[in-house]
């Protein structure tokens, strides 16, 4: 073990015993208690292997050549309060006199002695003594006044910053074990306590040699409550808790001091809850006493107070290895994290523990500081770890002090909010986070400006307070930055982010891909997928599918952007995009009349007649077939508003491979659909199969059918049923693929606007399936036949609701069609100003329109009948707007008169009615219609 130069014999001190008599008591008027030979210099001190030193031996100066022994005794007898006052006077002297050459002799010797003991690690073969304090040409800087205040003296700061964290390997000093013990001392621990366990049987004198322990032992330093810790700690301990191991522990042995690795004792200090919150250091509190101090002094000096972070040793080791092996840290100004020692440090060459690659989020030397966004792989870590860059080289003087990187939020500063997905920020590649694994950054030091501190704190709270996306499970995150990139490009936001800025910067895929609930991918058919999946039968239509980036630039169809101006049906000059396809006016009118008139055209030939400008009127059957094959649908004109979907093909959609991979439950059904005019489609699409699996269970109203019906009892039972169905709608919508990708406010708005439509639509489906539309099947325990309807006070309302199951009976709606129509009902009303995530909403709605087309194609054999079917079903959805408006009006009137009518309204239902129904009835919402009235 590296040998240590002893400072001189001291009074014995036993670990756990009372404090040393030399500490904590004023000794100005009495001689020294123990022998302290003044003639003995540091060059002739005996060598020992290790000594159990506490901080009571760190506050006394080393003798210097040419210094009077009386001065030594005077310094030796200074109390801690006198030492602190000396520091303050030195600061005031420095601030008043500008940049002097050196501090007063007494203070200089004291500071040098303390720093020689505190901050001087040693290598394996370094045993030469340190030069005396009086021979040191440049004074050490610990408390701030010694920092240069004028720009010409700025390079001297660079020489100061590096030794503060880790001295160079050529500097002689104490043994690595003792130096590490000095650095590890946490705040609040009394300097009179023993930090190293003495070997049993060995004397506790500072001059006695101690044999190194064969195995490193972990010592838990418990901080006890009491004033003695606070008073005896001295100014050296007034700050934040120190980081475990200091700079010496960052080299490869992660969190284990070199002394412990060589057989010493590793300190594992316990965190005290009293000191978990960030506190202002003594240097910052005394800032007004030194008006001449530069702001760099205040900013940099708090960087020795690194709080204790109980991280995993393997994590620290792997993090250190990555910092040491990264090429970006070997060149330039050498900006290193607090975990990375200087290149000259002997600990930098030690072998780290290989655990795997971790994201490298340290900012480059020539870039602005970026937020630390890599996630923590353990539980919530209360203390904040501040990583301050160690600046080397001439470029450090030209750069302003950087703020800290925070690897964990402090619970005392930030409350525990559920992590959420904030919207992406354009200037910096963005957490939804969603989730609890996301780490937000905020300043943890009082040296950071108040404006940036408050902004970061507000940003952290906003990011946590927003709605969280579905939990993604313990997925391993991708690398934080691309190879060769020096900046952290990981998006902060937990939401699916496909921003162009992150892609242009070369960032890796986002930590959280665009997923819906239960890990389902986000719905949406990209133009490239559509082009690849189109069958070879329709090559002319490939030119009309524009990429998303081009489509998002223009909100509507641009006639000039299309490659040609001919009708896709007959080849005549096109007049515009009609019903989703570029056609002429003649084919537009023909298609509208053919679909709305419900004509059954028959071809006299073999269904392969030529349709051109001259012969387009010869065979209406082939002309209509060609219109449907081109993708014309009566609701196609509404798709002009959608940015992502430009061409909707009614029957080609079933010919495309599924871009949405449904995991697990639908793998057997995720087959590619092919379509030909004479082939039937029998397989159920995976998404429709998923909609079947998330259908809510049967809900009961709790109505007592043994008692005679009264108006108040029926309405109260219906309200109780409505409350339960509203909760069911919320649960169902969360499981709906694509719905959780919307903003949380948009999700709430859509549910509040459409809950009545969903309830009455479900009522119609149950009445159609269970009683063939002859009665109103509200619930298994609440079925109203026509007689009970007449006896109720809302008979006219029952007749209005009865129209829906009768339409189901007339159209013979299938379950697949009902499920797709139900989702479209959820998406059929939006605010007048639009939604926050309008693009995702339009993409989701367009996807479910295509699913409805697929559901229609499961039963309809011809293209003509399929298009007619689509028109009939979408017309039913449009008619529901007027029907539901009557229900809204009756519900609001009943709610207003609920006390007079003795009708009870549940709490959640009351909130929705009071907040949204007046807005809906006042026309402050925008219904989305498939057809013009």
From Swiss-Prot:
Cross-link annotation Glycyl lysine isopeptide (Lys-Gly) (interchain with G-Cter in SUMO), location: 388, 531
Modified residues (Phosphoserine): 20, 81, 130, 162, 190, 213, 294, 345, 400, 676
Main localisation: nucleus
Zinc finger NR C4-type: from-to: 567-587, 603-627
Biased amino acid composition, Acidic residues: 220-231
The keyword DNA damage appears for this protein: no
GO terms for biological process, alphabetical: glandular epithelial cell maturation; lung alveolus development; maintenance of protein location in nucleus; negative regulation of gene expression; nuclear receptor-mediated steroid hormone signaling pathway; ovulation from ovarian follicle; paracrine signaling; progesterone receptor signaling pathway
Family: Belongs to the nuclear hormone receptor family.
Name the UniProt record assigns to this protein: Progesterone receptor
Organism: Gorilla gorilla gorilla
Lineage: Eukaryota, Metazoa, Chordata, Craniata, Vertebrata
Gene name as annotated: PGR
